[in-house]
A protein has these predicted regions:
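Short, conserved helix/loop micro-motifs enriched in His/Cys and acidic residues
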Residues: 9-23, 281-291
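Intrinsic-disorder/coil detector with helix-boundary
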Residues: 58-59, 68-72, 505-507, 512-580
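Short helix/loop capping segments that flank catalytic or ligand/cofactor-binding pockets
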Residues: 47, 69-72, 100-107, 113-119, ...
Length: 580
């Protein structure tokens, strides 16, 4: 900035560190005012250094009186009329005044929220005044231990005129940046070293004006000095304040959509900025206010490159911007189409470097109220305890590919009326222990091709009333060991054509009262009293080897034979299940 204003020769004489600042704005102030304010904040004073044997001069920036040139002596002589050949001081008035006695400066930094951020500085050389005049400065505009220097420099600045002497001399060598040693003053305590802090030269040369006469060339130097055992520093200057929020555009590297640091801060380009390009270096990192911010919880939405944001300033300080909100404009349009979608409240994101989005939408249109959730790819829901879903009317769920449900303990499913379950291909049900199925009235099972039941151990079927089984073609029954059938009343077998019983070793047919074998007009009847009746139109007995018969009495063709008894009546109390 000095070079831009034609100051090509300048030198810094610093004894203390003056670190660079993260962000510093010249706002609403001239270059000179900006440099003076910065110098005051850093405890720096400046003066011009003149060469004694040439016209060269340079600007010196200094932060301690120790770097000033050695002092030169100059006597006190109030009677300048009697002695004009020797440069002296003709007037010298010393004054002391009450100034602030201490400075307390405080600030806050979000990077160290628990840090006290406070520094105290007591003033020096206060023997003549009370020490109760404190200056409290917040914000102190520091972020670390450098704030102690800020407090000390500010204290020196507030007290830069606590002890001051003003004088008059004809010497042109008394100028700011030099030290003088006053001698010969009747007040002995004033004969000491002084630092020159101000100088106002006034000269006259009346004989150089045609038609005028005078007593010759005169030069008066009205100056101000302070004791040289302390460093003069400028008083703190008021910093320009920003009147209100401003709009800016979020910036970042070329091709990047989201550009932030570990704190979620972004960079912006202000609309008034004529110098910085719209890239990753357009501003400092700027914090973003969120709707909710807690320790590991809250709301987080990073402004994206190209979005318009509203920037406010903490305490109106242009060096401390903070983004308070975001706004739409003609190119960045809102979700939906206003005013048609004015009843909708929408939270819609955008896929990073893509065209997709995630969305949560609330529609408050009367009679069409709706909550809409859109997940561009995956959606995960985690519930650490209970979850309850209550649908008053209908619930439809469509899954394009696979569904997996894992229940660690129990699952209870209740259907009030009907349930229809359709499986397009295969269904496999595995029960680790016990399966119980209860049907109140009727169960119908239709299998298109094959039906197989495999039981590893025991299978019991219990039917309270009736059971009917119909096979269209063929039924096969295989029992590995024993097969028992118990019927409480009647058993009827009806075979349309042929029935064949094949027993590998022994077949026993037993009836408690009546055993009968019939075929047309032929009958074989066995009764419980031991009678056997064989009746038919013709009876043929053939024994290839023998036909044996033993009895006490054998009657042939003597009308002694009896007709077999009639078949007992069957009590038909079981319905024919074929009708069902």
């Amino acid at each position: 900035m000095l070079q831009e204003n034609g100051v090509t020769e300048w030198s810094p004489l610093f004894s203390e560190p003056h670190p660079s600042r993260e962000f510093c704005v010249q706002y609403g102030e001239t270059d000179y005012d900006f440099l003076c304010r910065m110098a005051a904040e850093e405890g720096i004073f400046f003066y011009e250094e003149h060469a004694y044997k040439s016209t060269d001069q340079s600007l010196v920036l200094c932060d301690t009186v120790r770097h000033l040139p050695e002092s030169f002596e100059i006597p006190w002589n109030p009677n300048t009329r009697t002695e004009v050949s020797t440069l002296c001081i003709s007037q010298f008035r010393y004054s002391a005044q009450i100034r602030p006695s201490s400075v307390v400066t405080k600030d806050y930094t979000f990077k160290r929220p628990g840090w006290a951020g406070r520094f105290d500085q007591e003033g020096q050389h206060q023997d003549y005044q009370r020490t109760q005049y404190e200056v409290y400065d917040y914000p102190g505009r520091f972020k670390g231990a450098h704030g102690q220097n800020f407090a000390r420099w500010q204290m020196d600045g507030w007290r830069n005129n606590a002890e001051v002497a003003r004088g008059t001399s004809r010497s042109p060598e008394i100028w700011p940046g030099r030290r003088i040693a006053l001698t010969g003053h009747p007040q002995a305590n004033l004969n000491r070293e002084w630092q020159v802090v101000a100088s106002d030269l006034h000269g006259e040369q009346p004989q150089a004006v045609p038609g005028r006469r005078g007593s010759g060339t005169t030069l008066d130097n009205h100056f101000a000095v302070i004791p040289a055992d302390r460093t003069w520093r400028p008083q703190p200057l008021l910093k320009p304040l920003v009147d209100g929020p401003q709009s800016a555009v979020v910036t970042g590297p070329a091709g990047e959509e989201i550009f932030c640091d570990e704190h979620g801060r972004v960079r912006v380009k202000f609309n008034w900025d004529r110098y910085n390009p719209s890239n990753q270096d357009s501003s400092c990192w700027i914090r973003v206010a969120q709707a909710w911010a807690g320790t590991g919880f809250g709301n987080l939405a990073i402004p994206r490159v190209g979005q318009e944001v509203i920037v406010d300033f903490l305490n109106g300080d242009p060096d401390q911007p903070i983004i308070m909100g975001r706004t739409y404009h003609h190119e960045n349009r809102t979700p939906g189409s206003l005013p048609g979608t004015k009843t909708q409240m929408t939270i819609r994101s955008k896929t990073y470097k893509g065209s997709g989005f995630n969305e949560l939408k609330f529609d408050d249109a009367t009679g069409k109220e709706q909550v809409y959730i859109h997940a561009q790819k995956n959606m995960n829901t985690e519930v650490l305890n209970n979850r309850t879903t209550d649908v008053i009317n209908n619930h439809a769920e469509t899954i394009g590919n696979n569904q997996m449900i894992a229940v660690t303990n129990n699952q209870i499913q209740t259907v009030g009326v009907n349930q229809i379950e359709t499986v397009g291909s295969n269904q496999i049900i595995k029960v680790g222990s016990v399966q119980v199925e209860t049907i109140g009235l009727v169960r119908a099972l239709t299998v298109g091709v094959a039906y197989q039941t495999t039981v590893g151990g025991i299978m019991n079927t219990s039917v309270a009333l009736m059971q009917s089984s119909q096979i269209g073609l063929h039924k096969s029954l295989r029992v590995g060991l024993g097969y028992d059938v118990k019927v409480g009343n009647n058993v009827t077998f009806t075979v349309g054509k042929t029935k064949k019983d094949d027993t590998g070793q022994t077949a026993i047919y037993s009836a408690g009262e009546h055993l009968e074998l019939c075929c047309g007009k032929a009958r074989l009847v066995l009764t419980k009293d031991g009678q056997i009746f064989l009746n038919g139109t013709k009876i043929h007995l053939q024994g290839k080897e023998q036909v044996n018969g033993d009895s006490l009495l054998i009657n042939w063709n003597c009308a002694a034979s009896k007709s077999p008894p009639k078949t007992p009546d069957e009590k038909q109390d079981t319905p024919d299940m074929r009708e069902y």
